[in-house]
Amino acid sequence: MIVARLSLTHRVDGPAAFHLIVDLAIERGEQARAERLCHARLGVIREDRDALLRLGHLLLDDGRIAEAVVIFQRVDAVEGRRGVVTAAFLKQHLDIARARRGESYYRWLDNVQVETSYWTIMRDGIVYNDDVHAKNLYTSPFVRGRVSADGTTIVATLPHPEYEIADACIFVGGDDNYSHWLFRNVLKLATLDRAGLLYRYPWLVNSDLRSYQNEFIQLLGQRPEQLVKVGRHAVASCKRLLVPALHTSDQAIGRGVQWMRERFAHLLAAPAQATHRLLVSRRDVTRRSLLNEDELFEALAPLGFVRIVPGELSVVQQIAAFSSARIIVAAHGAALTNMLFAPRETAIVELTSTAIEHMSLFRKLARTTQQPIVTITSDDYPLVAGEIEINTPFRIDTRRVVRAVEDLI
């Protein structure tokens, strides 16, 4: 009742009370009232950041994009942002028809800007992301949650270009995650290689290349002088950009995996030598670690399992280990992406938790590689339910894992 009475007045004494009554209006479906509350606060405090942000999001959710942009530009001024441009961008595929058909394809784009936080491409009010790098733009530091209710439009605040790239180059991009690097940056290069274009132009990549990025680039035979390196969290203006589309369909992923196996064939163990049983350890990380990993290894060791820590191995060593495996037991994590180097007959036991079981990348990959996969899901956490999130460590039922392995042997 106190909240209900508060919502009937335009007097807002502080940010907390303001957000409370705006939230209540939105919950009741009173969009117009929520906007009036914002305007009322701005009538008292003309450049109030809280009111401007709430009003901008209300307008964006209501589809009044141009009005929202004007409000967000006022936020820039309040925050003292200089040398930035805030504008709306409509999300678009490189080629929606070919994307829907699940094809592997590429497209030339002229006079574009590339932001190097989420590696999206922007031009003339269009943002290319879904088949370019496919990160969730809602969390982009340039977007900061400013996505329309229907998901078709974003508002981004971009700095002026830090890099001017006049020569044609290939959009490779960068990612801090080993798995994402393989799937978002390397796999798509298959399309250009088969078209005879992969080495015709320099590659656009992040300047702070991780060791595994450097190693994959070297293994693919690209020369250091053929890399165009740009810093992260910046904008690069590109005169002409060759953009291979992400491989997202089973059909395209399958072609990409086959290409990678062909390119790295000299590093793969012979199929007859693929007899090893691997437990893939995450003991070198804290995120989503397996709390009873030692207990699990003790249970699997009598069955001939050896434990490896991929984070402590070079790319070549990881490829060798996974390509020589007959059974792989692994907690859900980036290193399991190396299963694409294992033979088709290799069985996978994926260990996951209820917090991340919706992440189905490895099941999708197994479907394209035709590798048998068993997923074991745990709800055994060291925390109470309200504290659990996607990176929470978990325990696994070792008996279930052993039974799954015995069924696969």
Please identify what each model-predicted range represents:
Residues 5-7, 40-41, 74-75:
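Canonical positions in the second alpha-helix
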Residues 54-57, 61-73, 77-409:
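The feature primarily captures lumenal catalytic ectodomains
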Residues 20-21, 55:
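Structural register within alpha-helical repeat arrays
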Residues 28-37, 64-71:
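Structural signature of tandem alpha-helical TPR/SEL1-like repeats
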